[in-house]
Design a protein with these regions (language model features):
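Bacterial N-terminal signal peptides
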Residues: 2-15
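Long luminal/extracellular ectodomains of secretory-pathway precursor proteins
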Residues: 16-163
């Protein structure tokens, strides 16, 4: 679990921590385990805060037994997720905020509106050569810091190694 204080400190610095704590925040971190089992951080990835969930499923890919067809299917799911995001972001009110992760995979959104939103990461995001995608709900309540951890277990699509 990430330290909320350390994430805020990395974004606003020691002088701005008092002011930062006065606002509403969503803070989070991104990491996966690579094939060797080592933690790899989502460095310099675009992260989006959006108002609505994009329908997506890779179930058909997981049932595929032929390796190359499975890889192709997962790649197509990542591309479809990207295209759906591109279409939805044109809708008024869909894209709430955008940020970029730090070198250690941390990110923050300052003063998001109250309510339930989704933290979204999509193609062309890569971590350690893996395509990754997330769409995780987060609820913003006034005076509370929302925390989101994006990792292997809550990927919206299977990670796929880029070859």
């Amino acid at each position: 679990m990430i330290s909320v204080f350390s994430v805020l400190l990395s974004f606003v610095g020691p002088a701005g921590i008092g002011q930062a704590l006065a606002g509403d925040w969503i803070v989070g971190s991104i990491s996966i385990r690579n094939d060797a089992g080592h933690k790899a951080y989502g460095e310099r990835l675009s992260v989006f805060l959006v108002s609505d969930k994009i329908p997506v499923s890779a179930k058909k890919c997981l049932d595929e037994t032929h390796h190359q067809r499975k890889v192709d299917c997962i790649n197509n799911c990542h591309l479809d997720f990207y295209k759906r995001f591109q279409q939805k972001q044109m809708q008024t009110g869909y894209l709430i905020a955008q940020t970029v992760t730090s070198a250690t995979g941390n990110f923050a959104f300052l003063d998001p509106p109250p309510g339930t939103h989704y933290v979204l990461v999509k193609f062309p995001a890569l971590i350690d050569g893996y395509k990754v995608a997330w769409q995780e709900p987060v609820t913003v309540k006034p005076g509370r810091i929302g925390v989101v951890s994006l990792y292997d277990e809550n990927l919206v699509l299977p990670k796929n190694r880029r070859h």
